[in-house]
A protein has these predicted regions:
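Catalytic center-proximal scaffold of phosphoryl-transfer enzymes
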Residues: 1-306
Length: 306
């Protein structure tokens, strides 16, 4: 007869493992992402019964596909969507650029040393949605269609830029993309008395113009925040299946596991092999150095690469 195991025992041990063995690795990844010059950030709701409120949140942070030191994807649990959570993730004096959506929590008043970039794909999507919804109202649709048409060559041009460094990329963008983006903003700025969703789309695009133009300051800034939204997607699928976490410790443990799995995937590791490697070696490591267990470490790559 084996030891009886139930859901409660399994859950307690999953949490215990995250706190006792995986936390140093998690903290190291959190530390490293704070040193990145440009990062993606987004948040998604999650219910935690112990908090006695409708929504808590997982905040996701991800390094950029180009020019980052290492591929990292960090999840942070918080019981609020307040922009004050950002300081718990990257510190109150973060001086890099945070790619984000238009949510007011990403505030220069709260973080005067940081810069915020905005997702041009989100801006374009608002006009695309108008075209889909107002196909039988040609006046509004034609304005939205023209706005989308003005952005289309910009995305095409971005894919064909030639550069080796982020400085060269920024210079190429200023030369080739800026006239296209200027034309888009010139056009939507002269639209007279827009109404409804068209007005909202135009006002939002204009409000975020300074943040959109970050792409000309730093070539590492991407045009889109989609990568972090895609990184969040697995956690939303888990939310649909599990519905909620019972405890705060459970939610925090989830953030640890999401972080390690997400970062392992970005570094092309076999997830099962990586966790086995961690559990075989972490409990018996002779020193406090965690560097050798990071997903891009030489031995980890040798043992766990897909």
């Amino acid at each position: 007869m084996g030891m009886p195991v139930n859901d409660t025992i399994i859950t307690k041990n999953i949490i215990k493992v995250s706190e006792s063995y995986l936390m140093p690795l998690y903290k190291k990844l959190c530390e490293l992402i704070r040193s990145e010059e440009v990062i993606h950030m987004d948040e998604t709701p999650f219910q935690v019964l112990e908090e006695h409120k409708a929504n808590c949140y997982f905040w996701a942070t991800k390094t950029t596909a180009e020019f980052s030191r290492h591929p990292i994807n960090v999840f942070h649990y918080a019981n609020t969507r307040s922009g004050k959570v950002i300081k718990d993730i990257v510190g109150s004096n973060y001086q890099g650029i945070i790619m984000c959506d238009g949510y007011s929590g990403y505030s220069n008043h709260l973080y005067p040393n940081a810069k915020f970039g905005s997702c041009l794909v989100h801006i374009r999507r608002e006009f695309i949605n108008i075209i889909k919804a107002l196909h039988n109202r040609p006046a509004k649709s034609s304005i939205a269609q023209q706005a989308v048409s003005l952005l289309r060559p910009l995305f095409h041009m971005e894919k064909h830029l030639k550069y080796h460094t982020k400085e060269e990329k920024a210079a190429e963008r200023r030369k080739r993309l800026k006239p296209l983006l200027d034309s888009f903003y010139d056009y939507i700025s002269q639209v007279k008395r827009p109404l409804g969703k068209l007005r909202n789309a135009i006002q939002n695009a204009i409000a975020l113009k300074l943040r959109v133009y970050r792409i000309f300051e730093n070539g590492q800034v991407p045009l889109t925040n989609n990568p972090v939204e895609q990184a969040i997607r697995p956690s939303t699928l888990i939310r649909k299946n599990s519905l909620f976490a019972k405890s705060i410790r459970g939610a925090q443990a989830s953030a640890v596991y999401y972080t390690i799995v997400g970062t392992a995937k970005m570094n092309h590791l076999n997830i099962y092999k990586y966790f086995k490697y961690l559990f075989d070696h972490l409990p018996n490591r002779e020193n406090k150095d965690i560097e050798g267990f990071l997903p891009w470490a030489k031995e980890v790559q040798a043992q766990c690469h897909i």
